[in-house]
Amino acid sequence: MTSTQSVAVCATLILAIFCVNDIHCDPIAEARAAAFGEREARSDGEWKQFDVNGEKIEVNEQENREIIRQAGGDGVEGSVMVIDHAKGLISWSIPRAGECYLIGGVDKQLPDAQELLHYFQSAQGSADGEGVESALDYVKAEDRPVTDLNLLAPEVREACQGKSVYWLEKSSGDNNEPEKRRWCVYAYVRVRGVLVRYRRCW
C-alpha cells in the first residue's frame, strides 16, 4: 500500500455487509480491511467537499454540519448521513435497509465541523493510522417512530418520504441476539477513527 493509500480518511461509509448465520462476522475487522485511496478537496460556497474513492464528504464549518454520502450499487441508492452539531441531531438515510433514522445527540467522540475540516486539511498528503479506535453501536427503537419528518435534515428528507423513520438508540452491548437471526444488514460510517454502526437483523 502506498503512502497515499495509507492516509487516514476522516469519514467513509461501508454499507451492506450481509452476514447469514455467521457468528464470526466481525464489523471492526471489515472496517480495518477497507483500503482508503486518494482524496480530492474542493470548495462550493460554505461547503468544503472531499471525494474519497467515489464517496463524498461535505463539511460546513459555519453551520457546523457534515454530510457523508456513499455511492449506490446493485440498483440501490447510496446512504446519506447528516451530522448536525448545532441541532444535536444525526439524520441517516439507508436505502438498503428501506428505512431512515434519527439519532438524538451527537456523541462527543465525533469531531465537529471545525475539527473535521482541520483534520482533513492537516492530514492531506501525510500518512496517518487508519485503524478503528472505537465504535458507537446503535439499534432501532421499535417503539419510537418519528412522526415529524421535519426533524430530518433537508438533504435526506425527500429520500425518506413514504418510508418508516425511527429513532436509533445506543446499543446495550448485547451482541448475541443478532447472531440468532438469519439475516443482518450492517451500515457503517467512519469518522476520524470512530465507527458509527447500525445493525438490523431479521
From Swiss-Prot:
InterPro entries: BRICHOS_dom. Disulfide bonds join 100-160, 184-201. Keywords: Antibiotic, Antimicrobial, Cleavage on pair of basic residues, Disulfide bond, Fungicide, Signal. One of its GO terms (biological process) is defense response to fungus. Transmembrane segments: none annotated. The keyword Chloroplast does not apply. Residues 26-181 form a propeptide. The keyword Zinc-finger does not apply. Residues 1-25 form the signal peptide. Residues 73-168 form the BRICHOS domain. Has antimicrobial activity against the Gram-negative bacteria E.coli and P.mirabilis, the Gram-positive bacterium L.monocytogenes and the yeast C.albicans. This is Arenicin-1. It comes from Arenicola marina (Lugworm). The lineage of its organism: Eukaryota, Metazoa, Spiralia, Lophotrochozoa, Annelida.
